[in-house]
A protein has these predicted regions:
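Conserved alpha/beta-hydrolase "acid-adjacent" motif
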Residues: 4-12
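Conserved loop-alpha-helix segment in the C-terminal half of the alpha/beta-hydrolase fold
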Residues: 11-23
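C-terminal catalytic histidine-bearing segment of alpha/beta-hydrolase fold enzymes
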Residues: 24-106, 111
Length: 290
């Protein structure tokens, strides 16, 4: 569930498309880096705050090998019992649960409008093609915990100086003290603002378009008292500037919304995986508890 080399969008919502097509499929979607059970410190320093660290060491699972063996035994040899065709999904805080599908069914949506429920704290609505953050929005602190699941969207009205432009959206979970961690991001070439593969055109400066952005899949638990921060730029970490760079002007209001799908913890089947017993895992747990 992190953008390392296997990206979340390679599996989400593909897992549901497979199921809907009658193809038997199972998912094991963790927050992991390459922290294998026999060397859980292998890439530990790379999994920093907001990049999987909060899910450590619950991300270190050795039972996936048993799952894989049972899968191949059944489907290649006809041996044993058919594996359960469900999705095991891990939140950014490390909690594992079972879902029939992912994105799951029966979620509730929260819509936060830019300039309203998402307050502009940067004092600008302009994104310059230099990679620097322009508009920055923050929500009010949540009164209750919020569990964001799967594919948040950012639908935003914009105008551009030319037929082009790009928007990078960074979504962060911020504590009452203002300490923030990355929970996800989205990026869009505005020539494809309607989505899909067909390039669109419009009248620069004079015409407003609605960019229908979708975030990489995320599963993020937000504590009560925390707030969300949405920062917009022309490009971001691990991305190149757009080949059609342009000044982008954000239009705030009811047509520009951050849309979050949420789940209720009490409705879900949570579980704890086999515990990592490597000394590195134990030392980390003792350190965080202390």
């Amino acid at each position: 569930m992190h953008d390392w080399n296997v990206d979340p969008h390679m599996a989400v919502p593909v897992i549901n498309q497979l199921k809907d097509s009658g193809i038997e499929a199972k998912g094991l979607f963790g927050q992991w880096d390459h922290d294998y059970p026999d060397r859980p410190d292998y890439h530990f320093d790379r999994s920093g705050e907001g990049r999987g660290r909060e899910a450590y060491p619950e991300m270190v699972r050795f039972d996936w090998m048993q799952d894989l063996l049972e899968w191949f035994d059944w489907y290649l040899k006809g041996v044993g019992e058919q594996p359960g065709l469900f999705v095991e999904i891990q939140s950014n805080q490390g909690q594992w649960r079972i879902e029939d599908r992912y994105p799951p069914d029966g979620m509730e949506s929260i819509s936060l409008d830019l300039g309203g429920a998402m307050m502009n704290v940067a004092g600008t609505t302009t994104i310059l093609p230099n990679g620097d953050f322009g508009p920055i929005y923050e929500s009010e602190p949540f009164e209750e915990p919020v569990w964001i699941s799967a594919l948040p969207r950012l639908h935003v009205d914009v105008s551009t100086a030319t037929v082009g432009g790009q928007i990078y959206a960074l979504l962060e979970d911020c504590s009452e003290a203002g300490d923030c961690i990355h929970i996800g991001h989205a990026i869009m070439d505005l020539r494809y603002h309607e989505g899909g593969t067909q390039e669109q055109t419009w009248l620069p400066i004079f015409q407003t378009i609605n960019a229908k952005m979708e975030f990489f899949a995320m599963d993020a638990q937000i504590e009560a008292g925390h707030f969300l921060r949405l920062s917009l730029a022309s490009t971001g970490e691990d991305y190149l500037p757009a080949s059609t760079s342009s000044i982008v002007q954000i239009s705030e209001g009811s047509s520009s919304n951050l849309i979050l799908d949420t789940i209720q913890e009490g409705d879900k089947l949570l579980f704890d995986p086999p515990r990592c017993t490597h000394p590195y895992c134990q030392d980390w747990l003792n350190q965080t508890v202390g």
